[in-house]
Amino acid sequence: AAERSERIPDIVIITGMSGSGRTQAMHVFEDMGYFCIDNLPPRLIAQLAELVGINTGVGRHLAVTCDLRSQGLFDELLDAVAALEEREMSCDIVFLEASDEVLIRRYSENRRRHPIAKPGETTADAIQRERLQLQGVRDRADMIIDTSRLRTSALRNKLRMAFSELSDQQLMDVHVFSFGFKHGMPVEADIM
C-alpha cells in the first residue's frame, strides 16, 4: 500500500504518454479540491499560480496537465519548475505511462488517431516516437505511474494517497437514505 505523503506540493504537473490517463488523473485532482487547468503551456504555470493565489497561506493547490510532445516545451517545463522554486512554491511532476500494447488497444477502442501520428504512420510508430520525445520529462518526474494494468479506481487511490490532505475517513463518502422498492431502485445507489 502506498504511504501518505508528508508534504503536499503547491502545484502538481501531470504529463505523460497520450492515452495513459492524464484526463482521468485531472478528474481525481479536481475531486480533491485542486484548481485544475488542462493543457496549459508550461511558461504560464508560474503566472497562473500567482493569479490563483498559490503559496498565500490559503491552502489552495493547483494541478495542470501539460502536453509536452514538442521538444521546446520540455525546456519550458524545466524553466517553469525553476521559476516556481524561485518563488518558493513546491512543485511535483507526475508522469503517466502505459505499455505500447495497452495504448494501441485504447486508441483502437476509442477509434481515435494518435495525436502525433503522421499521415500513413502506424499508431505503434507514433507511440514509439512519443515515448522517445518524453524520455527527458520521465527522467525528471517525481512520480511515475504505469496505468497499463490500473483501473481508474486504483489510479484515484494512488493519487489520493500521494496528494490529498484529507484522511482516509474524509476521503470516503457515504450516503445513507431510505427508499421504497415500489418506485424502483435509486439510480445513484452503489450498494444496497
Where are these regions (language model features)?
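Conserved nucleotide-sensing/catalytic segment adjacent to the nucleotide-binding pocket
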Residues: E30-A82
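Short, hydrophobic/glycine-enriched beta-strand segments
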Residues: D10-M17, V174-S178
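Conserved nucleotide-binding/hydrolysis micro-motifs of P-loop NTPases
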Residues: R69-G72, A98-L103, L150-T152, G180-G184
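C-terminal accessory "lid"/substrate-recognition subdomains
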Residues: A1-E3, D125-I191
